[in-house]
């Protein structure tokens, strides 16, 4: 690891171990490197290996230097290949959070050795800005979620007895009943996460970066700035722009299948890298896809270490035979951005993780939301409010309804009843693409002013 590099401004970027966080941080790192900042990108070995194929091949790649974070290794800790949230069995998530916190001492050594001009950190490590402050290194929080859910959480923390001042966006009946008025926190675990997020936001030095854009969340960003007494700078949507002809494991067969379909005739189905639908949820989604009569690609994931599960066992009996060439089911992983960008993709059945919402908007693909937990119901509601998606309503017991899934897929992809959603999704994509790198100007100006460069 090099010490500070001459007169070049150096930035150490330190995301949480989730793939969506890594992806957004990497796209921000690329943008900063194109603006002549030298980037140190710090994560675990398994995560660094995953992002290497997405590093730029041009000379600017020298401006992004990967730095390994070593998590503690002991019999009661996770092995290195599980130092990521990607396909991590859910019961091991608390262990990963604990190991990440225990890496603070090693991160302090990295900070001391590199002595960057600035630390840009994520929202699950309040100890990172504290360590930076002890070395007189300024630190800025980059939040990879939306401003809307952050403002709800912070408002509930600051003013628990006061009504949220912004008109409520869409939140369907089941989620309204489930989430309490306290910013959506319903368990001790959720309260703990909320406290950690709030601490990371408040520790940021006068500026907050957020992976969003004003056309979508301006009113929430303005209120977030008031709550934090900090400048909120949108830098999104930060989305990986794939080369459609580039090599990706398994993509050639997917592309060949997609190339045979009519324009905007296919739905992509995925629930992210950290959520594994139950057997009952899988059956409802499968029956919904079958009844919709729409072409589909469905990515089915199992937790790491689950070598016994077969796709056939996770789906209704005879499902694959009945859908035939109309559907493709992929086990494990598929290049989401490439599939969404393909001209035959006309809808996205999504859990509404924030990165997936941003990708849908960038590529102009309308969303059929099937949120599962955390911030996802709020993200689905925001997409619906913006007119670029619709959410599949659950029954009063919170169960996914196959008829609702089938109906919305047909409406969004095929029928005239949702032409407005398709049109709005295309318009949103055009707005975002017309901005280009303009979204980074405010950020670079804020950083330059902050660092007096």
Curated annotation (Swiss-Prot):
It catalyses: mogroside IIE + UDP-alpha-D-glucose = mogroside IIIX + UDP + H(+); mogroside III + UDP-alpha-D-glucose = mogroside IV + UDP + H(+); mogroside III + UDP-alpha-D-glucose = siamenoside I + UDP + H(+); mogroside IV + UDP-alpha-D-glucose = mogroside V + UDP + H(+). UDP-alpha-D-glucose binds at residues 273, 336, 354-356, 359, 375-376. Gene3D superfamilies: Glycogen Phosphorylase B. Its EC number is 2.4.1.-. GO terms for molecular function: UDP-glycosyltransferase activity. Pfam families: UDPGT. Highly expressed in mature fruits. Transmembrane segments: none annotated. SUPFAM superfamilies: UDP-Glycosyltransferase/glycogen phosphorylase. The active site is at 21 (proton acceptor), 122 (charge relay). One of its GO terms (biological process) is carbohydrate derivative biosynthetic process. The keyword Cytoplasm does not apply. Pathway: Secondary metabolite biosynthesis; terpenoid biosynthesis. Keywords: Transferase. The keyword Transferase applies. It is an enzyme of class 2 (transferase). It comes from the Eukaryota. UDP-glycosyltransferase involved in the biosynthesis of cucurbitacin and mogroside tetracyclic triterpene natural products (e.g. siamenoside I and mogrosides IV, V and VI). Cucurbitacins have cytotoxic properties and exhibit deterrent taste as a defense barrier against herbivores. Mogrosides are nonsugar highly oxygenated compounds used as high-intensity zero-calorie sweeteners; they also possess pharmacological properties such as regulating immunity, lowering blood sugar and lipid levels, protecting the liver, and acting as antioxidants and antitumor agents. Mogrosides, the major active constituents of S.grosvenorii fruits, are a mixture of cucurbitane-type triterpenoid glycosides that have been proven to be powerful and zero-caloric sweeteners and can hence be used as a sucrose substitute for diabetic and obese patients. Belongs to the UDP-glycosyltransferase family. This is Mogroside IIIx synthase. It comes from Siraitia grosvenorii (Monk's fruit). The lineage of its organism: Eukaryota, Viridiplantae, Streptophyta, Embryophyta, Tracheophyta. The gene is UGT94-289-1.
């Amino acid at each position: 690891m090099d010490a500070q590099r001459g007169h070049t401004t150096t930035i150490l970027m330190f995301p949480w171990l989730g793939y969506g966080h890594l992806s957004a941080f990497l796209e921000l790192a690329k943008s900063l490197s194109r603006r002549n900042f030298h980037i140190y990108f710090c994560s675990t070995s398994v995560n660094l290996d995953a992002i290497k194929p997405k590093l730029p091949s041009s000379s600017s790649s020298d401006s992004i230097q990967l730095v390994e974070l070593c998590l503690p290794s002991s019999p009661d800790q996770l092995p290195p290949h599980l130092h990521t949230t990607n396909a991590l069995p859910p019961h091991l998530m608390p262990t990963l959070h604990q190991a990440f916190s225990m890496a603070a001492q090693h991160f302090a050594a990295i900070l001391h050795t590199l002595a960057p001009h600035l630390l840009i950190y994520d929202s699950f490590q309040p100890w990172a800005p504290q360590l930076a402050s002890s070395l007189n290194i300024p630190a800025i929080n980059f939040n990879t979620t939306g401003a809307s859910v952050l403002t709800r959480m912070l408002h509930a923390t600051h003013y628990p007895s006061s009504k949220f001042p912004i008109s409520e966006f869409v939140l369907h009946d089941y989620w309204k009943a489930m989430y309490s008025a306290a910013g959506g926190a319903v368990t001790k675990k959720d309260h703990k996460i909320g406290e950690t997020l709030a601490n990371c936001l408040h520790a940021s030095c006068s500026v907050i970066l957020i992976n969003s854009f004003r056309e979508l969340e301006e009113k929430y960003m303005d209120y977030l700035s008031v709550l934090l007494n900090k400048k909120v700078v949108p830098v999104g949507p930060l989305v990986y722009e794939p080369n459609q002809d580039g090599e990706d494991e398994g993509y050639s067969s997917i592309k060949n299948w997609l190339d045979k379909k009519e324009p905007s005739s296919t739905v992509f189905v995925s629930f992210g890298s950290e959520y594994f639908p139950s057997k009952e949820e899988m059956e409802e989604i499968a029956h919904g896809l079958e009844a919709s009569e729409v072409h589909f690609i469905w990515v089915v994931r199992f937790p790491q270490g689950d070598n016994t599960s077969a796709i056939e066992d996770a789906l209704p009996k005879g499902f694959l035979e009945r859908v035939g060439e109309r559907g493709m089911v992929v086990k494990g992983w598929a290049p989401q951005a490439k599939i969404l960008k393909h001209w035959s993709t006309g809808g996205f059945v999504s859990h509404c993780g924030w990165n997936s919402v941003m990708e849908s908007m960038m590529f102009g693909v309308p969303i059929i939301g099937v949120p599962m937990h955390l911030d996802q119901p709020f993200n689905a509601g925001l997409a619906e409010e913006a007119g670029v998606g619709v959410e599949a309503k659950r029954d009063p017991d919170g169960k996914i309804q196959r008829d609702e899934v089938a109906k919305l897929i047909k409406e969004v992809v095929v029928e005239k009843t949702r032409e407005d959603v398709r049109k709005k999704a295309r318009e949103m994509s055009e707005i975002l693409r017309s901005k280009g790198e303009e979204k980074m100007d405010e950020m670079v100006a804020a950083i330059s002013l902050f660092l007096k460069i």
